[in-house]
Amino acid sequence: TLVDTSRREAYARIGGLGDLSHASVVYSRDARYAYVFGRDGGLSKLDLLGARVVKRILQSGNAIGGSISQDGRIVVAQNYTPGGIKAFDADTLELLAEVPAEYAPGAFSKVVGLADLSGQRFAYALFDGGEIWLSDFSQPRQPKTLRFPAGQQPYDGLVTPDGRHYLAGLFGEDGVAMLDTW
């Protein structure tokens, strides 16, 4: 349901978005479009003015959220199954690149805590792998990824207001992992 918050009334309803349990939404820089990441692996681009689905794709078997680059050109989905992230062109939802979360040979992790950083970068946690990864999409089809140890089961993450530090709560132990992204 789309709501006009100034008038406090619903103005449209958009269906066909898949499994929305634990879904998340990010918005284009001009706030015209919303990108909905569904639990069923669906990624939907919505036109909020036209109240319609522009495009919907099934990009994984089980997704948990996503983010959009600071310039608004890249939408990234974080996935449980298969573990990893996928980057898409924000206009067309064309797949640009995939970064599998293979933390050891043949071992893949659920990805959680995805957050956008300056310079077309994204930070995220590998729940099963105990790591934080930082992927640079300055060349969207050839991302470069750095890996950092994080502790047991890093989970939800966020970036500090100055954009410098990425923090991930540790589900498997008492504590918080902090990565200086500069």
Task: Tell where the protein language model's regions lie, with residue ranges.
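Predominantly soluble domains enriched in secretory-pathway, periplasmic, or organellar proteins
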Residues: 1-182
